[in-house]
């Protein structure tokens, strides 16, 4: 089943089994007649955001990605998260005595980056500090990869501010419409960010 043993299997293997599962699901979806395998996108939050950053360096299957509150560099994350016990446990030590920090950091695979990415983060996120997203966005911009960064000023590890949730969803719809097609987002994301429209 999907109990504690299943969850524990991820520890020390951040970009391993989960990545394999994601790609198996992607392969299966690509066989469905109503799925256009040439126009697939992926999004994730927290560890899911980490996985989006990991996908960035390990597959070209997706036309675009969206990473929310995701880990980019495990080494710099170690000294800045409110939960220092978590990387100590998950990565079996500290950056100076465990090779897992480098092995499982998306930042270690920057030379493979190429997929357009929406990056969202909360300035009050102490779990995955928003500087992780700043580092990731800086890397994408330096590589001239189409990317957008939205920092939610009053939010932490989840967009809980009243005005943040509509922006959160609209920004995703806008990004996926831009790269995958389909119906456009209901509002102009740029105007939402600049508080130029009421919503």
What are these regions (language model features)?
Residues 1-199:
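Active-site-proximal cap/loop segments of hydrolase catalytic domains
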